Structures are given as C-alpha cells and as structure tokens.
C-alpha cells in the first residue's frame, strides 16, 4: 500500500469513530429531555429550575460530542 491509501483509510476510520462516539451523547440527550419533560409534567411549578438544570446537563453532554469531533480531527 502506498502512503495516500493509508491516509485515506485513516481518515475514514476517524470519521467512523466519530460517528460511533456521537451515539452516547445522542442517547444522553434523549434521556435528558425525556426526563425533563416528565419532571415538568409532574411538577409544573418547578419548571424554571428544571429547565435551568436541563440546559446545564445539555452543555455537559454536548461537550462529549465536541471532544469526539476534536479527537477525530487530531487523529486525522
């Protein structure tokens, strides 16, 4: 194999790795929003506090996806 083919394979593997790495944050966001809606339906008077905590959790979960993206770019 020549060097160009190896570089293409490494690039494709990093994209596949990033795709797999986004599964966790995607599932986490689904659970986060589902539980936030459930909590708001159960206690509507706490909706402001629940929303604030939800946005903090959203930021923490999205950081995982961004770290995966940066790692894919660095490895490439």
UniProtKB/Swiss-Prot annotation:
Transmembrane intervals: 13-33, 55-75
Keyword Cell membrane among record annotations: yes
Membrane topology: Multi-pass membrane protein
GO MF annotations, alphabetized: lipid binding; proton-transporting ATP synthase activity, rotational mechanism
Superkingdom of the source species: Bacteria
One GO cellular component term: proton-transporting ATP synthase complex
Keyword set, alphabetical order: ATP synthesis, Cell membrane, CF(0), Hydrogen ion transport, Ion transport, Lipid-binding, Membrane, Transmembrane, Transmembrane helix, Transport
Subcellular location(s) of the protein: Cell membrane
Main location: membrane
Site (Reversibly protonated during proton transport): 62
UniProt feature coiled coil, ranges: none
PROSITE patterns for the chain: ATPASE_C
Family: Belongs to the ATPase C chain family.
Self-association and partners: F-type ATPases have 2 components, F(1) - the catalytic core - and F(0) - the membrane proton channel. F(1) has five subunits: alpha(3), beta(3), gamma(1), delta(1), epsilon(1). F(0) has three main subunits: a(1), b(2) and c(10-14). The alpha and beta chains form an alternating ring which encloses part of the gamma chain. F(1) is attached to F(0) by a central stalk formed by the gamma and epsilon chains, while a peripheral stalk is formed by the delta and b chains.
Role summary: F(1)F(0) ATP synthase produces ATP from ADP in the presence of a proton or sodium gradient. F-type ATPases consist of two structural domains, F(1) containing the extramembraneous catalytic core and F(0) containing the membrane proton channel, linked together by a central stalk and a peripheral stalk. During catalysis, ATP synthesis in the catalytic domain of F(1) is coupled via a rotary mechanism of the central stalk subunits to proton translocation.
Protein name listed in UniProt: ATP synthase subunit c
